[in-house]
Amino acid sequence: MKKIILTLSLGLLTACSAQIQKAEQNDMKLAPPTDVRSGYIRLVKNVNYYIDSESIWVDNQEPQIVHFDAVVNLDKGLYVYPEPKRYARSVRQYKILNCANYHLTQVRTDFYDEFWGQGLRAAPKKQKKHTLSLTPDTTLYNAAQIICANYGKAFSVDKK
């Protein structure tokens, strides 16, 4: 009986200490870069959300479709790696923009242990595509207009 009580006490103590360690991991404050790296376009002033201009490409089968990556430099580290001291500093999102109807599809999200979507990649096991219709006069809609004007081909951008 004493062995059972001792075993349960040790198990409970271990479980409590594991939760405390995990809580400490969630509080990793980061200082994202203040200067915009060459090749990246900041979408909103004072927000760490960027388009990687070197990732932009036009679909050769459907020229109204433009593919690109958005990068978010995080201000709080995310523990998504198996190593307890490694954490994500940035998120890279692969997106597809349909310039004919301004539908934006987020295809994939990956975490990286360095800023600017660089370094060791960690991908969630299950990911779903999400598509939304961009609303006029929003930051994403304005960015989409610029991308479509510069990259999208053979389509009409008139939305009347």
UniProtKB/Swiss-Prot annotation:
Q: Where is this region: Interaction with vitronectin and epithelial cells?
A: 84-108
- Keywords annotated in UniProt: Cell outer membrane, Lipoprotein, Membrane, Palmitate, Signal, Virulence
**Effect listed in the UniProt record for changing residue 85 to E:** 50% reduction in binding to vitronectin. Does not bind vitronectin
Q: Which residue(s) hold a covalent lipid per the annotation (S-diacylglycerol cysteine)? A: 16
Q: Residues with N-palmitoyl cysteine lipidation?
A: 16
**Subcellular localization(s) per the UniProt record:** Cell outer membrane; Cell surface
> What does the annotation say about its assembly with partners?
Homodimer. Interacts with host vitronectin, laminin and plasminogen. Can interact with both immobilized and soluble vitronectin.
Question: Per its database record, what is this protein's job?
Answer: Acts as a multifunctional adhesin involved in direct interactions with host epithelial cells and host proteins, including vitronectin, laminin and plasminogen. In addition, interaction with serum vitronectin plays an important role in bacterial serum resistance, and conversion of plasminogen to plasmin at the cell surface aids in immune evasion and contributes to bacterial virulence. Induces a pro-inflammatory epithelial cell response, leading to interleukin-8 (IL-8) secretion and up-regulation of ICAM1.
Q: What is this protein called?
A: Surface-adhesin protein E
Q: Which organism is it from?
A: Haemophilus influenzae (strain NTHi 3655)
Give the classification, highest ranks: Bacteria, Pseudomonadati, Pseudomonadota, Gammaproteobacteria, Pasteurellales
